[in-house]
């Protein structure tokens, strides 16, 4: 079945465009060392390059990805191996894929009632972290001391 769903596109379109986005991200990481680490623009350069009025209809993802290429000079590339101001730990391939799953499922895990799976996995993993760090048992989820971020 390939009908337009709550994705606002058909599932086939979603797959096709999703692969393009993943390829764009992979290409970015393959070439990250070729970008200057720090932004190469002056204040207002990016805004001045944007259209004065919003688009009247949706745009193709190919065009959006081309726009992303144009944005590169206005970015500080925190994940670059040449960026030494802070640790380059803001993201990773597994984290990007996990973000896709989290965003794709649209889960809001603010309470156990809103997503038992989120809450129970979070508390379990944090209990593992307590053990790995050799912290006292009082920081585990079965006490009043912790277990949820």
PLM features per residue range, with description:
Residues 148-149:
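Conserved core of the PLP fold type I
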